Amino acid sequence: MSKSIEKMISHLKNQGFVFQGSEIYGGLANSWDYGPLGCEVKNKLKKVWWDFFVKKNPLNIGLDSSIILNSKVWKASGHIDGFNDPLIDCKNCKSRWRADKLIEEFDPSINTGIMSNLQLEEYINQNNIVCKKCQKKDFTQIRKFALMFKTNQGVLEDDSSIVYLRPETAQGIFINFKNVQRSMRKKLPFGIGQIGKSFRNEITPGNFIFRTREFEQMELEFFFDPNDSNDWFKYWLEQIEIFLTQKISLDKNNYKIRENLKDELAHYALKTSDIEFNFPFGWGELWGISHRSDFDLKVHQNLSKEDLTVLKEENNQKILANVIEPSVGVERLMLAIFWQAYTEEQLEENNSRIVLKLPYNLAPYQVAITPLSKQLNQNANQLFLELLKDFDAIYDETGNIGKRYRRQDAIGTPFVITYDFQTLEDQKVTIRYRDTMKQERILISQLKDFLNSQFN
């Protein structure tokens, strides 16, 4: 059986993971709501990231900065002047496209990052690139399209009240660098981690939850002395790989690390590597790590006139810290996890099943408890309530036992415990493994130890 992104999306919708945003009003393009099971996966993923990169790493601490910041922040960072995409319109069907993406889809070997708008325009004309929607070649001139959502704060709507929804969480960390460093008495090197919503008015978002206008980021800004002999870029790249393979069980065959060429680097970056995942629509950026030099602290120090340097005790020298930034989108990481987990299996006797082979620590429910007969409902429910004290458990007594197994397979529950009549005699239950469908009997008194051994 061959899986497709369309079938996976349909499955996730039907099972309560992801819903179309504003669906009863016809929806809103690229807006998604996370249902009861989707928000469980999302919250667990964020907790795993936070525990690994912030709580359990002695170098790092956390922050939760505002979504709406003083507009001077975005002036200093370069977002107001330079955070835009090349927009091109089809005169025939009125559809809008990112000019660079049209070229990259026409020829993936072209590095559009180093091309001016005029060069993009010339390439489209010379190569007879057509509109993806109507297949006509009749475009407007390319113009800059600002990616930040602009609004006004307060009762007056004039230039003095303009504010923006943040397009990244990083700047909230940079402007709080001195506050955090002073209040927590931190010495270099140290990192500040943050999870939060960001907003980008993308021209052509798409591919389900891969690229949306509203999304969550998990970012770490790691500050260090530029004369530090440690290779912090290498260290954090290794930590990302440990997280991907050991914490959320991503298959190494499904991702690759690509170092950006010099002409691909952002204006602030000395070095950047992308961890790319083999999504159903091809390879795409999953996680980025950049050496941002001292760019961010320098521009904020220059515009704010605040001293953002750190004093080195050994020689009383003031320095501006350099920054390594590992940054990942929550939804994009979820898409990779869902795509790897979504499995269609052909079983014996022309039977089949859809199973979400989610990592145990990300499954919405760790265990399901089900009675074999209505006569056993009370006993099974008592066991459920006992397990609920220590585990994410669900109780299911609807339909026959086969349908209950399929339901739990479909939402990724690692174990199903069946309470049957024999349980009344030997105090043993049947436990079924999601991935192998193997079953075994185990004493109720040993259940918690067994489950703890599986999840820890």
From Swiss-Prot:
InterPro entries named in the record: aa-tRNA-synt_IIb, aa-tRNA-synth_II, aa-tRNA-synth_II/BPL/LPL, Anticodon-bd, Anticodon-bd_dom_sf, Gly-tRNA_synthase/POLG2, Gly_tRNA_ligase_bac, GlyRS-like_core
Catalytic activity: tRNA(Gly) + glycine + ATP = glycyl-tRNA(Gly) + AMP + diphosphate
Domain of life from the UniProt record: Bacteria
Gene3D superfamilies: Anticodon-binding domain, Bira Bifunctional Protein, Domain 2
Keywords tagged on the record: Aminoacyl-tRNA synthetase, ATP-binding, Cytoplasm, Ligase, Nucleotide-binding, Protein biosynthesis
Function comment: Catalyzes the attachment of glycine to tRNA(Gly).
Protein name per Swiss-Prot or TrEMBL: Glycine--tRNA ligase
Source organism (scientific name): Mycoplasma capricolum subsp. capricolum (strain California kid / ATCC 27343 / NCTC 10154)
Gene name, Swiss-Prot/TrEMBL: glyQS
